């Protein structure tokens, strides 16, 4: 893609997200989401591969339908109460429509089916954008309207997302699909706590973006797309393979890595609000996600790759990609747990 066009698309995507995050008017929030969607569609389809074209078409249809549903909810609210302020929602159907529209944009269960299929058809860096940056604007709207969102609806969607995200990733051999189900499960943890402690949802979102960026940048750097490719990761660099192992374990929420802190705080908050059965069930079902993380780490860093050559490291050209961003994300992925109390005060 032409660098100028690429810069314009990325700038439009950033502008759309910022516009939505700073909006309290229905139309401006909707406009930001539409700008975001229209900017990323050419990025998804830039390889001109049939899978990329299919992925961009699916993404457009899903996002257009959810945007139309959100605008419809705004029109109903304006017709009934004469206000376009997104924080003033008093009608129950409007609340349900808005929550359903934003849940569709995020890929929450039971409207999650589009996310794994789209990620499978795009390059790794584009998949990284879809699973991180594209979650910011809808989540910002949910956090803005947290006191009007139906709590039973968010608890149900969050619980289903944790279960489906864990079970869906168990039999996956494609790393991008595995990361899609990982995204669904993590979004489930965020949406469960949003009507109770929205600041904890924001904290979880920031950490999720950090962990996912670290993991998928390593996949991009080593050109790993399947579990079979991950087996060869230690041949490229044992340090990278070990870093990939720690990043996946952090995504799984194992202490003493940074990924333990959001799950720990969310479970503590649920128990404080007398939601002990929900907290217990979510803690148990997250073991499904941990299972496929452990399987991937075992394959990538704890097994020797098949080799027909007498040397340990395979021949390769000097990599020309920068690892500065990967280094920063990896440090945050591994060492944020000790300062968790400071960040959540």
Swiss-Prot record:
Q: Where in the cell is it found?
A: Mitochondrion inner membrane
Lipid bilayer topology: Multi-pass membrane protein
The entry's cellular-component GO terms read: mitochondrial inner membrane
**Catalysed reactions, as listed in the record:** a ubiquinone + NADH + 5 H(+)(in) = a ubiquinol + NAD(+) + 4 H(+)(out)
Q: Which GO terms describe its biological process?
A: mitochondrial electron transport, NADH to ubiquinone
Membrane spanning segments where? 1-21, 60-80, 110-130, 149-169, 179-196, 200-222, 240-260, 274-294, 323-343
User: Is Mitochondrion one of the keywords UniProt gives this record?
Assistant: yes
InterPro entries noted in UniProt: Complex_I_Subunit_2, NADH_DH_su2_C, NADH_UbQ_OxRdtase_chain2, ND/Mrp_TM
Q: Which Pfam families match?
A: NADH_dehy_S2_C, Proton_antipo_M
Family, as annotated: Belongs to the complex I subunit 2 family.
Q: Which PANTHER family match?
A: NADH-UBIQUINONE OXIDOREDUCTASE CHAIN 2
Q: What is this protein called?
A: NADH-ubiquinone oxidoreductase chain 2
Gene designation per UniProt: MT-ND2
């Amino acid at each position: 893609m032409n660098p100028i066009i690429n810069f314009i698309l990325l700038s439009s995507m950033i502008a759309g997200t910022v516009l939505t995050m700073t909006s309290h008017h229905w139309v401006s929030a909707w406009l930001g989401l539409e700008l975001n969607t229209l900017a990323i569609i050419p990025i998804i389809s830039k390889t001109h591969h049939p899978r990329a074209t299919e992925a961009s078409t699916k993404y457009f249809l899903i996002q257009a339908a959810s945007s139309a549903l959100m605008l419809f909810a705004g029109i109903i609210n304006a017709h009934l109460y004469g206000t376009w302020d997104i924080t003033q929602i008093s009608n129950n159907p409007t609340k349900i429509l808005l929550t359903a529209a934003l849940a569709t944009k995020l890929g929450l269960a039971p409207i999650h089916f589009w996310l794994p299929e789209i990620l499978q058809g795009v390059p790794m860096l584009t998949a990284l954008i879809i699973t991180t940056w594209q979650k910011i604007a809808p989540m910002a709207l949910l956090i803005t309207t947290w006191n009007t969102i139906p709590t039973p609806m968010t608890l149900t969607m969050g619980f289903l997302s944790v279960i489906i995200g864990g079970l869906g990733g168990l039999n996956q051999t494609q790393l991008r699909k595995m990361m899609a189900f990982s995204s669904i499960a993590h979004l489930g943890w965020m949406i469960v706590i949003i009507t109770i402690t929205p600041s904890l949802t924001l904290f979880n979102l920031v950490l999720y973006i950090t962990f996912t960026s670290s993991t998928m940048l390593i996949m991009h750097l080593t050109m790993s797309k399947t579990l079979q490719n991950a087996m060869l990761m230690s041949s490229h660099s044992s340090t990278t393979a070990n870093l990939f192992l720690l990043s996946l374990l952090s995504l799984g929420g194992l202490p003493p890595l940074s990924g333990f802190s959001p799950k720990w705080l969310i479970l503590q908050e649920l128990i404080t609000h007398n939601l002990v059965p929900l907290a217990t069930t979510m803690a148990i079902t997250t073991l499904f996600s941990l299972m496929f993380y452990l399987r991937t780490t075992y394959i990538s860093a704890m097994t020797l790759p098949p080799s027909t050559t007498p040397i340990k490291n395979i021949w390769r050209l000097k990599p020309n990609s920068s690892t500065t961003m990967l280094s920063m994300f990896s440090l945050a992925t591994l060492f944020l747990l000790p300062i968790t109390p400071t960040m959540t005060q």
